[in-house]
């Protein structure tokens, strides 16, 4: 369990009024802020703090954001010129199939606006 503390008495003056997170399971302390002697986010053994007195600090725990599944990537192995030519001459590309949002779609079945959107989003100069 992790407990937030403010050190109120210590043999080491650098620890006085410093804030720490104590991990009782690991026997470790993480420095949140101290006058000197300890770096922010430094992790030390609790025993390194020596004899101390402290008061517990209430902590607000925010829920973790969990992403299930991961990323999604559509790969279309085409040249920009091929799609632009398919817009101008759809009769030459009756079987041209692309991936849009995970679905296979015939390019010619898209509206002109959707075709322009696919070309704009598929071919970028930089991120």
Swiss-Prot record:
Keywords: Organic radical. The keyword rRNA processing does not apply. Pfam families: Gly_radical (PF01228). GO terms for molecular function: formate C-acetyltransferase activity. The keyword ATP-binding does not apply. Residues 5-127 form the Glycine radical domain. GO terms for cellular component: cytosol. It comes from the Bacteria. The modification Glycine radical is found at residue 102. Acts as a radical domain for damaged PFL and possibly other radical proteins. NCBIfam families: spare_glycyl. PANTHER family: FORMATE ACETYLTRANSFERASE, FORMATE ACETYLTRANSFERASE 1. HAMAP family: GrcA (MF_00806). This is Autonomous glycyl radical cofactor.
């Amino acid at each position: 369990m992790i407990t937030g503390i403010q050190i109120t008495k210590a043999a080491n003056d650098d620890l006085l009024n410093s804030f720490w997170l104590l991990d009782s399971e690991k026997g470790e302390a993480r420095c949140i802020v101290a006058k000197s002697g300890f770096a922010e986010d430094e992790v030390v053994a609790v025993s390194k703090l020596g004899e101390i007195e402290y008061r517990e600090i209430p902590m607000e725990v925010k829920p973790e954001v969990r992403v299930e599944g991961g990323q999604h990537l559509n790969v279309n192995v085409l040249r920009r010129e091929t799609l632009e030519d398919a817009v101008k001459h759809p009769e030459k590309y009756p079987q041209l199939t692309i991936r849009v949002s995970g679905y296979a779609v015939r390019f010619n079945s898209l509206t002109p606006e959707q075709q322009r959107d696919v070309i704009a989003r598929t071919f970028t100069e930089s991120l």
